[in-house]
Swiss-Prot record:
PANTHER family in the cross-refs: CHAPERONE-ACTIVITY OF BC1 COMPLEX CABC1 -RELATED, PROTEIN ACTIVITY OF BC1 COMPLEX KINASE 7, CHLOROPLASTIC
Organism of this sequence: Actinobacillus pleuropneumoniae serotype 3 (strain JL03)
Protein name, entry field: Probable protein kinase UbiB
Organism ancestry: Bacteria, Pseudomonadati, Pseudomonadota, Gammaproteobacteria, Pasteurellales
Family, similarity comment: Belongs to the ABC1 family. UbiB subfamily.
Pathway entry: Cofactor biosynthesis; ubiquinone biosynthesis [regulation]
A Pfam family per the record: ABC1
Function: Is probably a protein kinase regulator of UbiI activity which is involved in aerobic coenzyme Q (ubiquinone) biosynthesis.
Length: 544
């Protein structure tokens, strides 16, 4: 470790000590050396004893700077790890820092674009429109040299020298995280190293603005001509790793409820559309904006009777596969049907908990945790907290962490919070239920079969010529099987006709499995077709 990193580590530890964060170290023999080292090396006392632990942790992270502030914000969404009071305090952390010099921003932008700003833009404002820990944004207009002359744009630029700062602090976070499991079983359950790894990936992704550009373009295409969501246009010719240029939008912040009401916005429809936008992203697109807090969501001030969201800052997104979506849809439906056994089986079938999990105990654990939720009316039940409860139970049964679902659960909490802030009577279940049912129907109904056949048509054509040969080979093998079975049958006649029939059935089953094994390199449909054909032949022979 370098001298600079050692000084930074010392600063981090002393800051935590001044806020009494070391009180989480349990007084047990295992931590004796840590407590002695703390007294010998760090003569620092808790200077904020009158404040609750959550407040002290928030203040400590605030003092340590942007990287730690963003860590606290991320942890505030991990309610599967922390008590609600602590998570609520961390949610108060604000990722707002003093902007860096506008002239420096100009230099960075010009270096990225390869020329003077005046080549492309007029009215570049060196005063930042907004500033955060990773980047800040400036406004400008396309000039007469551009096809979109006069178009208002926003230029986002990464803070200079932020990457080495982030990497240095992340390295120290890993070092601190490696100490956490030694404290107690509860500390081990936090899986601190996994949390830091997840945070590192998020931060490094945010440092590459070309990712944000690609995400925004994809989300914009998904909701092209949509009445529900508008995503500002990106201008790829001006986008680089540390600079992007996008359309400037003018909207009402979704958290400004009074202005929305004064503008005549249909608040009920606005709240319902927030849920619809989220579930459309999840179940239709398998791709969702995963940073949908109030600062990134606006409402189009035009046509308030038909309100439209505007989404910005697509630096953090989530993706889901078919298995993830099936888990979500079936788990939610099973939960609301109080079918806790199905919920338990879903976790095992998804391979997220061990195959030898005790299903009865798993079901009972879900029942004990989830049943009290139904003391509330269905309209008041939080989907985010349902997922949280499912995760908490599953973790006790060694569920592997699923980062994509943790990200989704965080986003769902954001959406629910905003929806109920806009319209407190929002019925999440009634709004979301059609999405869940339609998706499940499409996966298991006639439509799903026809769609699958259509998708596999090229494979059918490619392998169709193999089908007659496969059937012929299977029938030839069946003739040999029948001959051998007849020979065997003669020797068993003395033992009774029933036993003979049983042997024939058993051996036939074994041979059929062998036939299928021989065709394991064929597509599933062809193997199944072969099996059906062989079975029909067996039935016909049995009748004869």
């Amino acid at each position: 470790m370098t001298c600079k990193n050692t000084r930074r580590l010392y600063q981090i530890i002393t800051t935590f000590l001044r806020y009494g964060i070391d009180e989480i170290i349990p007084d047990i023999p295992l931590t004796r050396h840590a407590r002695l080292g703390r007294k010998a090396l760090f003569w620092v006392r808790n200077q904020h004893k009158d404040q609750p632990f959550g407040v002290r942790l928030r203040l400590a992270l605030q003092e340590l700077g942007p990287v730690w502030i963003k860590l606290g914000q991320m942890l505030s969404t991990r309610r599967d790890l922390f008590e609600p009071e602590l998570a609520e305090q961390l949610a108060l952390l604000q990722d707002s820092v003093e902007p860096f010099d506008g002239k420096s921003a100009r230099q960075i932008i010009e270096q990225a674009l390869g020329g003077s700003l005046e080549t492309w833009f007029d009215e570049f404002d060196e005063q930042a429109l907004a500033s955060a820990s990773i980047a800040q944004v400036h406004t400008a207009k396309f000039n007469q040299n551009q096809p979109l002359v006069g178009k208002d744009v926003v230029i986002k630029v990464i803070r200079p020298d932020i990457e080495p700062i982030i990497k240095a602090d992340i390295a120290l976070m890993y070092r601190l995280a490696s100490w956490v499991p030694r404290l107690s079983n509860d500390a081990r359950r936090l899986r601190a190293t996994e949390v830091v790894r997840e945070y590192e990936k998020t931060l490094l992704d945010e440092l590459d603005l070309t990712r944000e550009m690609a995400n925004a373009i994809r989300l914009r295409n998904n909701f092209e001509n949509s009445e529900m969501l508008y995503v500002p246009e990106m201008y790829p010719d001006f986008c680089h790793k540390n600079v992007i240029v996008m359309e400037r939008i003018y909207g009402i912040p979704v958290s400004d409820v009074e202005t929305l009401k004064a503008n005549g916005t249909d608040m009920k429809l606005l709240a319902e559309r927030g849920v619809q936008v989220f579930f459309t992203q999840v179940f239709r697109d398998s791709f969702f904006h995963a940073d949908m807090h109030a600062g990134n969501i606006f409402v189009n001030p035009n046509h308030p009777e038909n309100p439209q969201y505007i989404g910005i800052d697509c630096g953090i997104v989530g993706t889901l596969n078919q298995n993830d979506k099936r888990y979500l849809a079936e788990s939610f439906v099973a939960f609301f049907n109080r079918d806790y056994r199905r919920v338990a089986l879903m976790h095992v079938e998804s391979c997220w908990t061990p195959a030898d999990t005790d299903i009865d105990a798993f079901e009972q654990a879900f029942r004990e945790v989830c049943e009290p939720i139904f003391a509330k009316p269905l309209s008041e039940i939080s989907f985010g907290h349902v997922l949280l409860n499912l995760f908490n139970v599953a973790r006790e049964f060694n569920m592997e962490v699923q980062p994509q679902l943790v990200l989704l659960q965080k986003t769902l909490l954001y959406i629910e919070g905003l929806g109920r802030q806009v319209y407190p009577q929002l019925d999440l279940w009634q709004t979301a239920k059609p999405f869940l049912q339609n998706w499940l129907n499409e996966q298991v109904g006639v439509k799903a079969i026809l769609r699958d056949l259509k998708q596999r048509a090229p494979q059918f054509r490619e392998h169709f010529a193999e089908f007659p040969e496969a059937v012929f080979n299977a029938l030839q093998q069946q003739k040999q099987i029948n001959f051998r079975l007849d020979e065997l049958n003669k020797t068993l006649q003395a033992q009774g006709r029933q036993k003979s029939h049983n042997v024939r059935s058993i051996v036939s089953g074994v041979i059929i499995l062998g036939v299928l094994w021989r065709f394991d390199d064929l597509p599933l449909w062809l193997s199944c077709g072969t099996l059906v054909t062989v079975l029909l032949v067996l039935l016909l022979q049995r009748k004869s």
